[in-house]
Amino acid sequence: MTFRHCVAVDLGASSGRVMLARYDSKHRTLTLREIHRFVNCLQKTDGFDTWDIDSLEKDIRLGLKKVCNEGILIDSIGIDTWGVDYVLLDKQGQRVGLPVSYRDNRTTGIMPQALVQIGKSEIYRRSGIQFLPFNTIYQLRALTKQQPELTAQVAHALLMPDYFSYRLTGEMNWEYTNATTTQLVNINTDDWDDTLLAWTGAKKSWFGRPSHPGNVIGDWICPQGNRIPVVAVASHDTASAVIASPLANKHSAYLSSGTWSLMGFESKMPYTTDEALAANITNEGGAEGRYRVLKNIMGLWLLQRVLKERRITDLPALIAQTEALPACRFLINPNDDRFINPDDMRAEIQAVCRETDQPVPVSDAELARCIFDSLALLYADILHELANLRGEKFTQLHIVGGGCQNSLLNQLCADACGIRVIAGPVEASTLGNIGIQLMTLDELNNVDDFRQVVSANYDLTTYIPNPDSEIARHVAQFQPKRQTKELCA
């Protein structure tokens, strides 16, 4: 067969999309077409911040039906989403409780309990995962302690992409790359860790053994009656994004830039040393047995909240205004935990600047300048941490995802990091999703083969660092800004 048609369902923390890929195996050309795009946002339900997963499922099915109604024969479907969140089911497959978001405050104070009762080094030795207060391990502990009446009803716990695959196929799966984000998978066995799981109060019977990407979960029956395989892709969206990052060599780092920024490098071995623990490095699972050694950064969430609060719809115009402002007048630590989900992001940023005796950003452009400069400096700081960890400097940084369209931030990043930045592809999570599907269909050999296809089919933009830029002069001064209570601590 010359052509393959694969559908990627890519759900982010702020939006979702159903994308159709067409792959010409003879000429190795790959094109994407957006079929359906929809909003994903938090809603308050019974006092909890929750996801509207019924609406998301409706939009997923609508997008798939649109493809089928065009008369296109779909070869496979894959689903990727954000990490750590889950859905509980009873024996009949019906939901138990609410699909609570990681941004909900129910996990406040839970992580410190684990550090005392199990020990920080012991948790890290077992999982190799970064300490984030909303990791699934702490969410499950919050659930079993705060809502114990629900636990007796639970038969299964599915992470978000596995839940939507289940809704399409009726078959359950626990995909490995996303499972590792829970901080509950043992880094040595690739299976659920008995000690960590027992601490949460959840039962091991709720989970099946994690499976590596590339297996067929089951079939979705389209309106025309065709059975279409649903593939377990690298279902954590960052894992998919990294697959589509055209990394040139082992000296290339990546930055998946969106609501979250995830900066790291690929490795065939995990880093679980005392130094890695002190730097709060995470070793998330990747495709083909690779590890994604990285750090989570709050990312463009701060900007997204400001845009929403200020009702700003013309982002390019705002960026143009921002570029005209002087650099580094207002600096914050974007990973300060006070930015996780404040009532008013603008007011929170202003408060930090006021408390640290800086000028206070007032205009929308000043707020954006504060966010962009601070992110670029944080990127530089973390890249330096990662280089020290592996004992070798990086020569270039690949920025992928929606954030790579921000040329101002890309240049600031190059200047602050002092290395060449390669921006693109934009739809990295979608492409990585498609890549695993094509490998499962035996159209491609491996991840490296797929990256060659990405490089040949998608435009990449290079940014050269300017050592004389204003932001480059502030890199050494930024470290004190990070001495706050970080999200990733």
UniProtKB/Swiss-Prot annotation:
Involved in the catabolism of L-rhamnose (6-deoxy-L-mannose). Catalyzes the transfer of the gamma-phosphate group from ATP to the 1-hydroxyl group of L-rhamnulose to yield L-rhamnulose 1-phosphate. It comes from the Bacteria. The gene is rhaB. It is an enzyme of class 2 (transferase). It comes from Salmonella paratyphi C (strain RKS4594). Keywords: ATP-binding, Disulfide bond, Kinase, Magnesium, Nucleotide-binding, Rhamnose metabolism, Transferase. This is Rhamnulokinase. Pathway: Carbohydrate degradation; L-rhamnose degradation; glycerone phosphate from L-rhamnose: step 2/3. GO terms for biological process: glycerol metabolic process; rhamnose catabolic process. Substrate binds at residues 83, 236-238, 296. Its EC number is 2.7.1.5. Signal peptide: none annotated. Its cofactor is Mg(2+).
